[in-house]
Amino acid sequence: MATYAAFKHVELYNVGKAKKRVLRAPGGGSSDIFGSDMPQTPRNVKNRMASNIFSADKDAAQKNNVRQGAHRFYFIGDAPRRGQKPVDSYSRLFGEPARPITPGKNHMKSSIPFGQNTNAAQQLLANNKGKYNGKSGSVSSASSSVSSSTENLKINVGNRSDGNPVTGEGYKAGGNDYIQPTAAMNGGNQVINKNRVPPGGYSSGLW
């Protein structure tokens, strides 16, 4: 038969001491039930909401290399650099092919001529051989469009005479040709009504 000392409960030796409480879930820092000092290492919890756009993880290079496949010869921990030219077997054996240097196009520069430099604008239009505003080689700028519109107004004002702008009655058809009023039916005199009411009345917003 076993002695009583062999079956003593562990709590009998800790009668005068305060009970250790579990402050965290099992597996946490203070769940040591045997009283030995465990090394206090902080738990590595990954924040799922954190963005890693600007700084890569420690394991990102290793995961990236594994994901890219075995045909890419990277050492583990060697991340491929952004903007690095791909190295193929031809360039490794024979070197880079000599390419002619072409100047880069300035995409932010406008091709619309502005300002007082009309000679350069006309030269540009002559090179393009296009028609702008119905005239070949004309400068498409704010000042020229304003002057051409006022010129057109002067021409149109000179050709106008008294008449109805909606129906066209009373305008000159040609040089001195007037629209002749037709004789009234049944041989009576034609009555010219000068007080005409426009279609829809005066309150229609057109007059």
Curated annotation (Swiss-Prot):
Coiled coil: which residue ranges? none
Task: Indicate where the modification Phosphoserine is found in the sequence.
Answer: 30, 111, 138, 149
**InterPro entries from the entry?**
JUPITER (IPR033335)
**Pfam families in UniProt:** JUPITER (PF17054)
Q: Where is the composition biased (Low complexity)?
A: 136-149
- Where does the source fall among the domains of life? Eukaryota
What keywords does the record list, in alphabetical order?
Cytoplasm, Cytoskeleton, Microtubule, Nucleus, Phosphoprotein
Phosphothreonine-modified residues are 41, 102
- The signal peptide here is none
Q: Which GO terms describe its molecular function?
A: microtubule binding; structural constituent of cytoskeleton
Which GO terms of the cellular component aspect does the record hold?
cytosol; microtubule; microtubule associated complex; nucleus; spindle
UniProt subcellular location: Nucleus; Cytoplasm; Cytoplasm, Cytoskeleton; Cytoplasm, Cytoskeleton, Spindle
From the UniProt entry, list the residue stretches annotated as the region Disordered: 129-174, 188-207
Residue spans of biased composition, Polar residues class: 150-164
Q: Does the keyword DNA damage apply?
A: no
GO biological process annotation, one example:
positive regulation of microtubule polymerization
Q: Does the keyword Nucleus apply?
A: yes
The record's family statement is: Belongs to the MAP Jupiter family.
Q: What does this protein do?
A: Binds to all microtubule populations.
How is this protein named in the record? Answer: Microtubule-associated protein Jupiter
